[in-house]
Amino acid sequence: MAGKVLHSSFTTPFLGNITHHMASEDHGWNLILVNRENYIPADYEVQLTELSNGKKVDSRIYPELQEMFNAARAQGYGLFVREGYRTQEEQQQLMDEKIEAYENEGKSKPEAKKLAEQWVAIPGTSEHQLGIAVDINADTSKSSRDDVYKWLEENAHRYGFIKRYPSNKTDITGVINEPWHYRYVGKEVASEIYSQGICLEEYIETLE
């Protein structure tokens, strides 16, 4: 999963009259909380490493990501990064496509937008735009999805990653269960979150 270093920066999206806050970097880059209430900081910049399959991640998480993949593969699990860093434009395209799909099913524009936002993060609120979150899929020629997701759930914290959107925390995160979405927070924090069975929002509250 070797790669090359690239650079990128984030441009604040036009948010109209939406009430929002810019996510705080007070607790460090690895603990930036991005969700529907907290948008990516306007001046956020990221140095990217390109993986062998063309996906990109923040260079700071690359060593632990590689370590995690090496460990999984050594135990016979086949997995790969399906999604890494996304630009603002790419996130907007995903949203537009999801809205269009619902409209094609006969939903009104407002209905389609509301439904789409249950599945796709509003541009400016996606952790993929930080570069420190990855969607991990199974190489089904080697492992089942369930086996890979189970391994990740039980072991990702050892490498600094957390399952960002657990099924029992939807009311807090505002996002449905995503067993493939892992976010880097650092090994110490990831172990705390894992052992306590909490989500990132709850952990950040303990720091306030």
What is the role of each PLM region?
Residues M1-E208:
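Extracytoplasmic cell-surface/polysaccharide-interacting catalytic and binding patches
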